[in-house]
Design a protein with these regions (language model features):
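Flexible coil segments in periplasmic/lumen-exposed cytochrome c-class electron-transfer proteins
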Residues: 40-41, 109-155
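Gly/Gly-Pro-rich "capping" loops immediately C-terminal to redox-active cysteine motifs
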Residues: 46-55, 72-107
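N-terminal secretory signal peptides that target proteins for export/translocation
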Residues: 1-14
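Generic structural signal for alpha-helix termini and adjacent loop/cap motifs
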Residues: 70, 104-105, 129-132
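The canonical Cys-X-X-Cys-His
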Residues: 56, 60-70, 122, 126
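Electrostatic cytochrome c docking/interface patches
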Residues: 34-59
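Bacterial N-terminal signal peptides
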Residues: 15-30
């Protein structure tokens, strides 16, 4: 009989239990992360209304189109707000990030002059123009809510 057997069995059992515990924790953390990702809203979840986008079009035409163009294709000094370039530039960021950029830096000749509702309307128009679907509830105007909505090119 092996003289180390009495101490080996408890050690092996302890290692086995520890291995199971680590596996369970890792699996649980992975499942929770996947659930959190699945629960996150994106621009593909109908985060604005068609009415809000129509209101945003009017604001855009009045305050933004001079620089960004009627087709949102950008200009000499202005980035495009439509198409693959726009989505690529903002993919992985939140609608809140875009809201903050517009609110604090636009329009270029009068930064910060748009109120929160106008910025949300313009955002709704930009999203609509980029073929993201409208939904039943309007896009909110607060950073906390907007920060929970991701911009992505994937549905």
């Amino acid at each position: 009989m092996n003289k180390h057997l009495p101490t080996m069995v408890p050690r092996l059992a302890a290692r086995f239990v520890l291995g199971i515990a680590v596996f369970a924790l890792a699996t649980g953390a992975s499942v929770m992360a996947l659930r959190a990702q699945g629960a996150a809203r994106t621009v593909w979840n109908g985060v604005f209304t068609a009415e809000q986008a129509a209101q945003g079009k009017a604001v855009f035409e009045n305050k933004c189109a001079t620089c960004h163009g009627a087709e949102l294709n950008g200009g000499e000094m202005s980035p495009p707000l439509a198409g693959a370039m726009f989505v690529s530039n903002w993919s992985g960021q939140s609608v809140g990030d875009l809201f903050t950029r517009i609110h604090t830096t636009m329009p270029q000749n009068d930064p910060g002059s748009l109120n929160n509702a106008e910025v949300s309307q313009v955002l709704a128009y930009i999203l609509s123009f980029n073929q993201f679907p409208a939904g039943a509830a309007p896009l909110p105007s607060d950073d906390a809510s907007l920060g929970q909505i991701g911009i992505t090119d994937k549905k």
